[in-house]
């Protein structure tokens, strides 16, 4: 089990700032969806560094991203 970022879509859509996307060090992990005006996380790419949480919660005081625990997918043996 490990932690990944999870965006609260409705709260994020209120701000439309995209700062978390700019600060995420992992390419194509944290993206912005124009149709909902909010960020979204590609869980398989998230390394759990929490930089996005720091930017959103501590710097901007918006609290739209939190870390959630996930379990890795079971790999099938061939």
Swiss-Prot record:
UniProt enzyme class: oxidoreductase
InterPro entries, per the entry: 4Fe4S_Fe-S-bd
Quaternary organization: Heterotetramer of one alpha, one beta, one delta and one gamma chain.
Keyword Zinc-finger: no
Free-text remark on how the cofactor is bound: Binds 2 [4Fe-4S] clusters.
Gene coding for it: forD2
Protein name (record): Ferredoxin oxidoreductase 2 subunit ForD
Binding site for [4Fe-4S] cluster 2: 24, 46, 49, 52
Chain ranges of the 4Fe-4S ferredoxin-type domain: 3-35, 37-66
Residue sites binding [4Fe-4S] cluster 1 per the record: 12, 17, 20, 56
């Amino acid at each position: 089990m490990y932690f990944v970022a999870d965006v609260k879509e409705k709260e994020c859509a209120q701000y439309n700032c995209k700062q978390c996307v700019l600060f995420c060090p992992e390419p194509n992990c944290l993206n912005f969806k124009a149709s909902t005006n909010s960020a979204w996380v590609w869980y398989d790419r998230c390394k759990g560094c929490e930089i996005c949480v720091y930017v959103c919660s501590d710097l901007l005081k918006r609290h739209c991203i939190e870390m959630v625990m996930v379990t890795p997918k079971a790999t099938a043996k061939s």
